[in-house]
């Protein structure tokens, strides 16, 4: 897997798994100096890379990568590995194996996102804190079946290796995943389960119970679904990890014999239940609380009576309440579905949620202190009512039990007062207990569901448990976790080096075995030995007055100074107090023992527990049904008798028991180790903190593994690789030119090198090196290579320079040659013949090209003709191919059916032989078991008699006890005075009891010694059995070879059938592709027809668009002409205005001068007055005329602007229509192109089919020849069939029945398939409707967005207009001020203007005439434009109608497309159904034929064997039934004895109650006695527990013996008797123990009337004595059993002889079987030959069929693409139509607003005119304002400014010509007269203009009326659109609700 091409199977995950070839080559070629490249110790980074600069006196000076120079000791410098080891996948292969090398290898791989790395047997994984594509399905398939060295490191590789080892080695496997919280343990566990669920699927769904209504999935789904449920209730956010598992789990995945998933189960460890009631600030409680509060399922909020605010609940809101990386709503749905998939009932599901809600309510319960008392009382009952409702309890009883719990004092129950803090503690303990028990119950229920009862043979266990923990504050939880890791590390060390040393042994290397597992034994024994930490903790928990201090003192007494691993911690500032330290393999840990005793006892409020047991909620009652309360002990003896010992089981004892089970499971498996690492505390991807990672490597045991690895030979290389790599060190040692073995070459090479020869060893295939030696060899190799390379470089450089010199010489000669030729050319360049040559040369080439073009045209015509001929031939060949394919399919079906029948017959024959052998073996086993059962029955009857004798003796003892009790009654009255003395005696009795316990422990040790002796005897038996197994091994080998031959035959037959089936499927697929091709051709023709129609429509639309474009262009040209005319009009008007202003200024100047100069005579004054009056009159007339003219011009200008704007909008709408049509045209062109490409692909497919046809014809001829051979075989088989036909009558009848069943099933299947197809069709219709509605919604949203954008644009345009208006107003004001200031200065200009006034007046008249003519022409153009606008409106309506028609046609086209698509899908579904049906029918037919042939072959032999077997089985079943009855009777006796014992116990407790009733007067003494009694009860419980422990020990012995017995039964020996006898001994001991208990109970029943205190002590003393006697009896019985074992060894020897005889018989049977095998072998050889021929034919056909299927698929995909493109085009067309309609409406609205504004503007102008008439007196000021307005329109006219400046200069000149002006006054009068006449003319023109404006106003009103009607139509259309949108929303909501 080294090349990039081989890594391609991993897809996009390849760069995240292994370096590319380029990177590897670059790494090997990197410069590297092995002597100077090192790692040095750094206080910040732990280790850094550096270059050694000098070494002096044990000190090393080095320069780090950062540029710093450091000096360190020699032992703080570590050599760096060569570059070829960079990012190495297995760190155990590194040359220098130490901490910095491991650290930097992990760091560099992590930087390249390669998160998995091997370290020997470990797989180390670093949390990437981001998603990587390394878990995709393609990666799963890539790792399947790959060996570890063939694929990059990965959790899938570990999983697959475990799976393959399980299948090949037939051994259970385990995967141990450890690491700190947040390191990725849970994710890797999920990936392991995902991998197994993917590669080992069963494919069968669990049977669903119709009554239960569970939504169960497959086993794989349930295994995967168990994770979300466990994570919801067992995972929480911590400081380091958002999804931290707060419990350990061991998931066992069971597999069947074939490797398929069979079942699974889960074991959990150390759930952190304290998190239920308390969390740190940065953490939160378990996910389930926040999932429920997320309100994803509102029904839960109502059911649990809670709110959605986590801060309303105290237990869950102490820290964080949300996690960014977790969606609680989605997780709730996943949890809820997991509960359903895992098969929880509805009641159980409700109970889970209710109990979770009750825990939240418990946190809100409030209590307060009573006044003047310490007693607590409830502070409100509302929360308690909710909690009680959810737990189906009475609220008052719950509060009473919490505040006033009942305590058993003596024989009475007394209510005890509780403080507020005690009540809160009790509530928290109950909440934690409910949650813990519910979690454990859920795990049990999951295990029940995952247990499918399918046969299971092996399992793979996945252990996800917390890694080693070293915190500042370490408590009991940390001790448990660290102890678990210590045991796991010991297990790893032992396993790792057992394998390592086995390899040494296999390679033939001398090695002394070292058990590295013993390295950790001292710490483990310190914790778990009899007087270890856990033992002392449990002992202290039994004493009522024990404290943490007493516990610490006992620890110091036992271990301080005696064990090196137990130390007294040194006090550290700023850290919590530590009481003792333990030296673990990962470091020294300081432990604080505060509260350990309470944690270990785990007390609960027994009164509330009693309420829970009586709860109406079955689940809650079941959870606490196992809890033993004081009331249950006092009242219910029957229930309390069985679990009295287990009720006081401590947390540590339960933990040790679970840990021992786990280690037992792991020891029985082959383990695989995964270590998870946290790279940094900040969850930053790609960053790595050195100190943190090193700490985890130590805690995870990675560095421990490296330490042990260095003691051996960690580096090893194959001989061939070593020879190739290190041959350069001494090439002369290996002779050239002759063959030499790689091993010998390596030995010679190493012998010739100067190294320490004790540091390496030679194995059979590899050379092994001690750590560091390989690095030395690498340094030597580098030095040698450096010498060789320098020498090679010198040679190469000399050679290259010589080559360069030769080139330079050749270049010199070439230059001389070129110079000579150029000089010659320069001489002949002007020669006339050479010029002629230059001209003719190009003409020759053009003639040649014309000839080539002519030839190419001829060839083109020929190819056209050939193409037509080939098309005709192709059609003929296609028709022939169809007929030939049908014939070929028929023939192949016949051949396949006959071959299958033959193969199945042979397979059935082999299976019958196997079943016969198995049945014979089972018969032997059953007979042996029956004999053993008879012996056991005899032994049990004897033991029963002995027990009856012992019962009679015990009755005598009871009589003696009754006499003593009578004496005790007499002494009753004196007991009151002796109470104090008795308490002292009780203390003495305690001491005696302690002595008895010590004696009992000594007896237990002796018992353990006897068990060890027994184990030794069993070992001896095992050695004997090994000798026997060796003899039987030969038989097994022969049988194995026979089985292999049979398997080979079966495999060949299966492969043959598979190939034939594939051939048949390929033929069917070819037929399907032919049908698909025909359908596609038909669709293509229809498409072409539709496309031709669409093309015609497109051409029509294009013609219409061209016409519209022409009209638009004409209108635009006309608009441009009008604009030019307007501009000319404006210029002329400005010119006239300027002239008028000049004249007015000149008149004013003249008048002023006349006033100044005209004072000479009164006549002149009067003249001046008259002239001035006339002048004023003329000015007024002129101003009125100019005002009217300006008003009319403004009106005309506005109307023209309106018409231009309307035309512009119409042009815009037409352009939009044009763009829309062009878009449709482009889309249709794209569709045509797609269809053309589809046609091309179809034509290519046709060509391929022709090619296939030819090949198939050739194959058909070959198949025909093969068919003849098959026909010959068929004839032979038919002859055999005829011979066997006489015996097939009965089987033919069975066959008919099966056929009937098959037909019935097929009919049912057809009905079901029809239903399925109908449902699929409905689903597709619903999805289509949904998609259309989604598209409609999308288009509506798009319309809305467009409207919003247009509205914003209009608003912006409006704002711009307003800004323009304001700007214009400001400019008007500026001009007004300017002209007001300039008017004062213009008096001087009038004198200059006098001369030119006449000329200018004349020009003004001409200009007015021109203006009038232009006004008339404008009116005409306006009329013409209005007509054209109306025509354009008509055209627009036509185009809209055409668009609507196109829309309708498009919809019809969409409908046709949808119908064809639906038909295609229906035919496809029918085709698939028919294919499936045909396959199932063919398989059923094959099965029936196989059964028929099998019955023909072995009918007689089966009948005979069946009769014999039935007889033997009936005999054996009778014997077994008798044995079972006898055992059942014994069990009944045992149950009866247990019942009697429980009755005695109740009588004892009644006696105690009566005694305590009489002592009620003395309460203080009674309490003391109760304490004493409770201690004795505890000791009795301890004794009962010890007895139970003895029972468990005996049961373990029995189980181990049972396992050995089963193995011996399989190997046909008689060792079963040993186990049965031991079981008998065990039953005898149990019966004796039960008898003793019954006698004790009867004695206690007789003591009911005793009332004295001595009775209690006497009873316990008697119990202790009896326990001692029982132990002595058991010891004697064990000794007797050891003697019996010696006798049974002798029996085993006899059984060995019997097995020898059996072996000889088996050899005889083997000879018979070998003869049969020979016959079958001959038949197989002939079949194999035929099979090989068929395989070659099938492989050819299969390859060709794959090509055909691929081409058909491509054609189908393109057709689908065309359909989807058409649908998209239709949708886009619809969207464009909607947008155009919307824009049309917007346009009309804007037109209306423009017209409104125009009206307002006209009204304002009219008001201004009216106001002007009223203010005639202020005409002069008004003239200036109008002049400023006129000037504002010509602000950009530069000529006016220049003219003004010239006029100013002229005015200055006119001051000198005043006399000439006086002479011209008469002439001016004449001019005034003329002006008056012209003013009258102007008035007439103004009236005419007013009439025209009235006409235009009428037209405007008409247009406005039409606009209002259009607006109404738009409103109606908009209301219809809104209705459609409402309907679409209703349909959408219905679709969503239905989904």
Swiss-Prot record:
PTM-bearing positions, type N6,N6,N6-trimethyllysine: 130
PTM annotation (Phosphoserine): residues: 79, 392, 625, 1092, 1162, 1237, 1243, 1261, 1278, 1288, 1292, 1303, 1306, 1413, 1474, 1495, 1514, 1542, 1547, 1554, 1574, 1600, 1603, 1714, 1726, 1739
Domain-related comment: The rodlike tail sequence is highly repetitive, showing cycles of a 28-residue repeat pattern composed of 4 heptapeptides, characteristic for alpha-helical coiled coils. Limited proteolysis of myosin heavy chain produces 1 light meromyosin (LMM) and 1 heavy meromyosin (HMM). HMM can be further cleaved into 2 globular subfragments (S1) and 1 rod-shaped subfragment (S2).
Phosphotyrosine modification, residue list: 389, 424, 1464, 1492
Gene3D superfamilies: 1.10.10.820, 1.20.5.340, 1.20.5.370, 1.20.5.4820, 1.20.58.530, 6.10.250.2420, Kinesin motor domain (3.40.850.10), Myosin S1 fragment, N-terminal (2.30.30.360)
Superkingdom assignment: Eukaryota
Domain IQ as annotated: residue spans: 785-814
Protein name (database record): Myosin-4
Keywords recorded for this protein, A-Z: Actin-binding, ATP-binding, Calmodulin-binding, Coiled coil, Cytoplasm, Methylation, Motor protein, Muscle protein, Myosin, Nucleotide-binding, Phosphoprotein, Thick filament
UniProt KW Transmembrane helix keyword: no
């Amino acid at each position: 897997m080294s090349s990039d091409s081989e890594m391609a199977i991993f897809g996009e995950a390849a760069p995240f798994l292994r370096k590319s070839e380029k990177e590897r080559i670059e790494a090997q070629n990197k410069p590297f100096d092995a002597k100077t490249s090192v790692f040095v110790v750094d206080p910040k980074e732990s280790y850094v890379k550096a270059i050694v600069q000098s070494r002096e006196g044990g000190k090393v000076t080095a320069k780090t990568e950062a540029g710093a120079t450091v000096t360190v000791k020699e032992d703080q410098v570590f050599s760096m590995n060569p570059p070829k080891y960079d990012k190495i996948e297995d760190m155990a292969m590194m040359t220098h194996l130490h901490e910095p090398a491991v650290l930097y290898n992990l760091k560099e791989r992590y930087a390249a996102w390669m998160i998995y790395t091997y370290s020997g047997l470990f797989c180390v994984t670093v949390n990437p804190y981001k998603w990587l594509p390394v878990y995709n399905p393609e990666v799963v398939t890539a790792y399947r079946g790959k060996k570890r060295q063939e694929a990059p490191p990965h959790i899938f590789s570990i999983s697959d290796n475990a799976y393959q080892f399980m299948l090949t080695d037939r051994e259970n496997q385990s995967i141990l995943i450890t690491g700190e919280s947040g390191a990725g343990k849970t994710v890797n566990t999920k990936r392991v389960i995902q991998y197994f669920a993917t590669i080992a699927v069963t494919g069968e769904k669990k049977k669903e119970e119709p009554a239960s209504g569970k939504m169960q999935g497959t086993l794989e789904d349930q295994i995967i679904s168990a994770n979300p449920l466990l994570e919801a209730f067992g995972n929480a956010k911590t400081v380091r990890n958002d999804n931290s598992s707060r419990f350990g789990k061991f998931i066992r995945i069971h597999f069947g014999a074939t490797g398929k998933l069979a079942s699974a189960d889960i074991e959990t460890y150390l759930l952190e239940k304290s998190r239920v009631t308390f969390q740190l600030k940065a953490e939160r409680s378990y996910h389930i609380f926040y999932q429920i509060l997320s309100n994803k399922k509102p029904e839960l909020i109502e059911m649990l009576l809670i709110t959605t605010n986590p801060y309303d609940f105290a237990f869950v809101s102490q820290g964080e309440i949300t996690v960014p990386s977790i969606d609680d709503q989605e997780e709730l749905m996943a949890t809820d579905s997991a509960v359903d998939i895992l098969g929880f009932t509805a009641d159980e599901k409700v109970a889970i949620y209710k109990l979770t809600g009750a825990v939240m309510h418990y946190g809100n319960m409030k209590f307060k202190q009573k006044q003047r008392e310490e007693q607590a009382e409830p502070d409100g009952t509302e929360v308690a009512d909710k909690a009680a409702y959810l737990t189906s309890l009475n609220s008052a009883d719950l509060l009473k039990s919490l505040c006033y719990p009942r305590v058993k004092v003596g024989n009475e129950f007394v209510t005890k007062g509780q403080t507020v803090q005690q009540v809160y503690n009790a509530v928290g303990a109950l909440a934690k207990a409910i949650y813990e028990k519910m979690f454990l119950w859920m795990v049990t229920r999951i295990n029940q569901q995952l247990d499918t009862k399918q046969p299971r043979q092996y399992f793979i266990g996945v252990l996800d448990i917390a890694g080693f923990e070293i915190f500042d504050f370490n408590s009991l939880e940390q001790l448990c976790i660290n102890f678990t890791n210590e045991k796991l590390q010991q297990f790893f060390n032992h396993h790792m080096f057992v394998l390592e040393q086995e390899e040494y042994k296999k390679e033939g290397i001398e090695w002394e075995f070292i058990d590295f597992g013993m390295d950790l034994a001292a710490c483990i024994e310190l914790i778990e030995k009899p007087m270890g930490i856990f033992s002392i903790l449990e002992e202290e928990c039994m004493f009522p007055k024990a404290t943490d201090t007493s516990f610490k003192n006992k620890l110091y007494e036992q271990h301080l100074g005696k064990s090196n691993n137990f130390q007294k911690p040194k006090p550290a500032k700023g850290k919590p107090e530590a009481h003792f330290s333990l030296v673990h393999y990962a470091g020294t840990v300081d432990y604080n023992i505060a509260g350990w005793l309470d944690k270990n006892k785990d007390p609960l409020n027994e009164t509330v527990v009693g309420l829970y047991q009586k709860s109406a909620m079955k689940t809650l009652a079941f959870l606490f049904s196992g809890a033993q309360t004081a009331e249950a002990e006092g009242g219910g003896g029957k229930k309390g008798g069985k679990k009295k010992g287990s009720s006081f089981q401590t947390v540590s004892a339960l933990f040790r028991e679970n840990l021992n089970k786990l280690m037992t499971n792991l020891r029985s498996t082959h383990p695989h180790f995964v270590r998870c690492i946290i790279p940094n505390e900040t969850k930053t991807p790609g960053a790595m903190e050195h100190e943190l990672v090193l700490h985890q490597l130590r805690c995870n045991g990675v560095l421990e593994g490296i330490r042990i690895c260095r003691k051996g030979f960690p580096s090893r290389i194959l001989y061939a690789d070593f020879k190739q790599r290190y041959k350069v060190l001494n090439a002369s040692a290996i002779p050239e030119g002759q063959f030499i073995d790689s091993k010998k070459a390596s030995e010679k090479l190493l012998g010739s090198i100067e190294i320490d020869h004790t540091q390496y060893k030679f194995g059979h295939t590899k050379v092994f090196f001690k750590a560091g030696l390989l690095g030395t060899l690498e340094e030597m190799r580098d030095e040698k290579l450096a010498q060789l390379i320098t020498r090679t470089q010198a040679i190469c450089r000399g050679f290259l320079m010589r080559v360069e010199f030769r080139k330079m010489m050749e270049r010199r000669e070439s230059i001389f040659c070129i110079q000579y030729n150029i000089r010659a050319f320069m001489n002949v360049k002007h020669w006339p013949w050479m010029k002629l040559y230059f001209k003719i040369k190009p003409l020759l080439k053009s003639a040649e090209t014309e000839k080539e073009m002519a030839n190419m045209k001829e060839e083109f015509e020929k190819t056209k003709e050939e193409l037509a001929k080939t098309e005709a031939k192709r059609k003929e060949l296609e028709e022939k191919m169809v007929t030939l394919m049908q014939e070929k399919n028929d023939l192949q079906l016949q051949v396949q059916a006959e071959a299958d029948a033959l193969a199945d017959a042979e397979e059935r024959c082999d299976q019958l032989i196997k079943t016969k052998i198995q049945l014979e073996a089972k018969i032997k086993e059953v007979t042996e078991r029956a004999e053993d059962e008879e012996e056991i029955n005899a032994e049990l009857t004897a033991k029963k008699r002995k027990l009856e004798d012992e019962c009679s003796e015990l009755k005598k003892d009871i009589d003696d006890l009754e006499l003593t009790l009578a004496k005790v009654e007499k002494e009753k009255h004196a007991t009151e005075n002796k109470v104090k003395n008795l308490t002292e005696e009780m203390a003495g009795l305690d001491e005696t009891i302690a002595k008895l316990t010590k004696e009992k422990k000594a007896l237990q040790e002796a018992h353990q010694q006897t068990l060890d002796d027994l184990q030794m005897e069993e070992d001896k038996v095992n050695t004997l059995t090994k000798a026997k197994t060796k003899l039987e091994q030969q038989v097994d080998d022969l049988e194995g070879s026979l089985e292999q031959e049979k398997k080979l035959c079966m495999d060949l037959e299966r492969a043959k059938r598979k190939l034939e089936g594939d051939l048949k499927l390929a033929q069917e697929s070819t037929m399907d592709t032919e049908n698909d091709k025909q359908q596609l051709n038909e669709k293509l023709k229809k498409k072409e027809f539709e496309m031709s129609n669409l093309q015609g429509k497109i051409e029509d639309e294009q013609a219409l668009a061209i016409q519209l474009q022409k009209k638009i262009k004409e209108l635009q040209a006309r608009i441009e002409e009008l604009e030019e005319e307007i501009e000319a009009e404006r210029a002329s008007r400005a010119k006239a205005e300027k002239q008028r202003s000049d004249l007015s200024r000149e008149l004013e100047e003249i008048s002023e001068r006349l006033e100044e100069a005209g004072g000479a005579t009164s006549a002149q004054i009067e003249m001046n007055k008259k002239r001035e009056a006339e002048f004023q009159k003329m000015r007024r007339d002129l101003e009125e005329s100019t005002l009217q003219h300006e008003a009319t011009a403004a009106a005309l200008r506005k109307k023209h602007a309106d018409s231009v704007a309307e035309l512009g909008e119409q042009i815009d709408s037409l352009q939009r229509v044009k763009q829309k049509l062009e878009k449709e045209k482009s889309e249709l062109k794209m569709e045509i192109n797609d269809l053309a490409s589809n046609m091309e692909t179809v034509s290519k497919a046709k060509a391929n089919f022709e090619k296939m046809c030819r090949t198939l014809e050739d194959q058909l001829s070959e198949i025909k020849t093969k068919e003849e051979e098959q026909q010959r075989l068929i004839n032979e088989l038919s002859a055999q069939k005829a011979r066997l036909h006489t015996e097939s009558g009965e089987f033919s009848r069975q066959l008919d029945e099966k056929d009937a069943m098959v037909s019935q099933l097929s009919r049912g299947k057809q009905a079901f398939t029809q239903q399925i197809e109908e449902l699929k069709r409905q689903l597709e219709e619903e999805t289509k409707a949904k998609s259309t509605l989604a598209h409609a919604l999308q288009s509506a949203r798009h319309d809305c967005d467009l409207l919003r954008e247009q509205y914003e644009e209009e608003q912006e345009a409006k704002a711009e207009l307003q800004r323009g208006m304001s700007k214009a107003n400001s400019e008007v004001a500026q001009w007004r001020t300017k002209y007001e200031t300039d008017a004062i200065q213009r008096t001087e200009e009038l004198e200059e203007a006098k001369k030119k006034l006449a000329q200018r007046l004349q020009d003004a008249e001409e200009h007015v005439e021109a203006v009038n003519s232009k006004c008339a022409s404008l009116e005409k153009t306006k009329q013409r434009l209005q007509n054209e606008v109306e025509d354009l409106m008509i055209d627009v309506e036509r185009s809209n109608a055409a668009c609507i028609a196109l829309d309708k046609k498009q919809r019809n086209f969409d409908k046709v497309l949808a119908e064809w698509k639906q038909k295609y899908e229906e035919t496809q579904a029918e085709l698939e159904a028919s294919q499936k049906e045909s396959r199932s029918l063919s398989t059923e037919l094959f099965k029936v034929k196989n059964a028929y042939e099998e019955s023909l072959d072995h009918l007689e032999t089966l009948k005979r064997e069946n009769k014999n077997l039935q007889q033997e089985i009936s005999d054996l079943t009778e014997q077994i039934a008798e044995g079972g009855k006898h055992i059942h009777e014994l069990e009944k006796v045992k149950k009866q004895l247990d019942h009697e014992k429980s009755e005695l116990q109740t009588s004892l407790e009644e006696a105690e109650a009566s005694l305590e009733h009489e002592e009620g007067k003395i309460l203080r003494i009674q309490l003391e006695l109760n304490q004493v009694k409770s201690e004795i009860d505890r000791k009795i419980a301890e004794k009962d527990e010890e007895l139970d422990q003895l029972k468990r020990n005996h049961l373990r012995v029995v189980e181990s013996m049972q396992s050995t017995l089963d193995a011996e039964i399989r190997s046909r020996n008689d060792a079963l008797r040993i186990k049965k006898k031991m079981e008998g001994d065990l039953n005898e001991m149990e019966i004796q123990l039960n008898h003793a208990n019954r006698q004790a109970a009867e004695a206690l029943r007789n003591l009911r009337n005793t009332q004295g205190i001595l009775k209690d002590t006497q009873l316990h003393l008697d119990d202790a004595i009896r326990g001692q006697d029982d132990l002595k009896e058991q010891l004697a019985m064990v000794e007797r059993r050891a003697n019996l074992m010696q006798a049974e060894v002798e029996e085993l020897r006899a059984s060995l002889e019997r097995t020898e005889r059996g072996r000889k018989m088996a050899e005889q049977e083997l000879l018979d079987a070998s003869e049969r095998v020979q016959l079958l072998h001959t038949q197989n050889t002939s079949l194999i030959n035929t099979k090989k021929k068929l395989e070659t034919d099938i492989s050819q056909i299969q390859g060709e069929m794959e090509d055909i299927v691929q081409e058909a698929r491509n054609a189908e995909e393109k057709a689908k693409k065309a359909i989807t493109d058409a649908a998209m085009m239709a949708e886009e067309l619809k969207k464009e139509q909607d947008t155009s309609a919307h824009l049309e409406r917007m346009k009309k609205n804007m037109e209306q607003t423009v017209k409104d504004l125009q009206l307002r503007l006209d009204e304002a102008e009219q008001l201004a005119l009216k106001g002007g008439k009223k203010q005639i007196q202020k005409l002069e000021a008004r003239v200036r304002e109008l002049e400023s307005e006129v000037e504002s329109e010509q602000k950009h006219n530069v000529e006016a400014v220049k003219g003004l400046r010239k006029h100013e200069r002229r005015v200055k000149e006119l001051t000198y010509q005043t006399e000439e002006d006086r002479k011209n006054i008469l002439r001016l009068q004449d001019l005034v007269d003329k002006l008056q006449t012209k003013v009258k003319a102007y008035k007439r023109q103004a009236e005419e203009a007013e009439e025209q404006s009235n006409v235009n106003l009428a037209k405007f009103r008409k247009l406005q009326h039409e606009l209002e009607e259009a607006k109404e139509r738009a409103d109606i259309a908009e209301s219809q659109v809104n209705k459609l949108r409402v309907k679409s929303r209703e349909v959408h909501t219905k679709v969503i609700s239905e989904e």
